[in-house]
């Protein structure tokens, strides 16, 4: 019922959240337990495939919101103690748990993790015919601090040795594999620090994402409508926020997402 309306209004792409199975509905699908399973809350795998096929028939691409930045802590239905080894996929010690998300952090330096996550990308592309991915929480992957409590004001803040080289390697490999499986696939990075080169081509020294999200725009928009009367809106400031991007990176600009509508950021 929704797809015809989307097509009629001229949209050619949709993003679907909470696809991967997750035990807690309130996590919005971001505490993933079964990375290769379509969430049973919303229907069967065949029904998801039918939805994607129907969208394609209407000329609508379908992007999956994929979560490779962390995993749920649950051990019964998750990877937290898979095969009796709590560290098979995750960092040991103090780096094991994410300090803000109550979840586990993948150790991207392990071959098992790289193979697991790369095959996960390939699986959703081939089995369900998704047209690409929006990678969630990329900032958390890039930095040992997860980007928490840090200000990124100049290029020195991006290249000071606090970056997780293994995670950067994984993201680059993921983009390479995804575009080998489907050269027309779209990859989008949700990233708040402004890491240079994220959406630049791999051959140019970038990470290979097709787009990065302009996350400054919704923050600016929410602040404006909440704190300023209409007469105080400055067109020059609005123009600068919308056009503030690097020339070598394509950017997806937007005014609102689930972060604003549901989470309340």
Residue ranges with predicted function:
Residues 1-163:
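Substrate-binding/active-site clefts of carbohydrate-active enzymes
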Residues 129-131, 146-265:
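Conserved alpha/beta catalytic core and glycan-binding cleft of carbohydrate-active enzymes
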């Amino acid at each position: 019922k929704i797809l015809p309306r989307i097509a009629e209004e001229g949209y050619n792409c949709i993003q679907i959240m909470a696809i991967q199975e997750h035990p807690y509905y309130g996590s919005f699908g971001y505490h993933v337990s079964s990375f290769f399973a379509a969430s049973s809350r919303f229907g069967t795998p065949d029904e998801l495939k039918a939805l994607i096929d129907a969208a394609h028939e209407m000329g609508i691409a379908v992007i999956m919101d994929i979560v490779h930045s962390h995993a749920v802590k649950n051990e019964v239905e998750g990877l937290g103690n898979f095969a009796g080894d709590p560290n098979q996929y995750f960092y040991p010690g103090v780096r094991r748990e994410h300090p803000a998300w109550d979840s586990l952090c993948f150790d991207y330096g392990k071959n098992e993790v790289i193979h697991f996550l790369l095959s996960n990308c390939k699986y959703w592309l081939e089995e369900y015919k998704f047209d690409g991915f929006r990678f969630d929480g990329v900032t958390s992957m890039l930095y040992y601090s997860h980007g928490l409590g840090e200000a990124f004001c100049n290029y020195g803040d991006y290249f000071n040795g606090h970056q997780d080289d293994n995670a950067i390697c994984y993201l680059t490999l993921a983009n390479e594999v995804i575009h080998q499986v489907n050269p027309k696939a779209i990859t989008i990075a949700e990233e708040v620090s402004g890491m240079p080169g994220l959406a630049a081509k791999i051959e140019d020294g970038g990470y290979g994402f097709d787009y990065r999200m302009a996350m400054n725009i919704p923050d600016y928009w929410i602040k404006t409508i909440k704190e300023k009367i209409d007469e105080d809106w400055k067109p020059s400031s609005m123009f600068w926020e919308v056009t503030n991007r690097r020339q070598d990176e394509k950017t997806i600009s937007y005014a609102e997402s689930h972060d604003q509508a549901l989470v309340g950021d």
